[in-house]
């Protein structure tokens, strides 16, 4: 068993991925042209230096706190969990980064989130207009905001809270989204920092999910290749079909 473990570990791991991103709360009706035939969708923007992808889109939903490994992040809640909807829509725009080890990835993400949390369940909120003008959002500035936050947090300035990558990625994405829906994103849109998604290290596998150890397959998220329930299930069906024909 030890020799099998050693063979599997030696040179088997590639990179570890971690996603961080701003959670966006906007007017629900602005994306109706995209969502008229589906409950949610994934939108992805390819930039020269990054890829930004929407995650966990919740039309008429709310934003809640997510507690994970001692970290507190903004997350989305389906409106059906409360029985009534809101005029808002929320999603996270994730941008992945890759590290040589799981430890490096976790240190990078947790340090950013912990700095925001400040030892409690602190989450920072900023108006889109304020972000674009590089000024902090204040309590007074929120009094007349037409989009009401579904989660209470500290109003502030994302520029001093998170790395520029996630701000620039959001700005680029929203610009393309405006072109796509052919209307400007409401400047009262609210931005919550910061959501995160952690992954297992990517393991070297072939096209059939088989590792360097003959006959040992990794199905689902443990491979670091699939990243959701549907992808994990699909990989299981794929490998099962392959095994039934060999």
What are these regions (language model features)?
Residues 1-246:
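Residues forming the flavin
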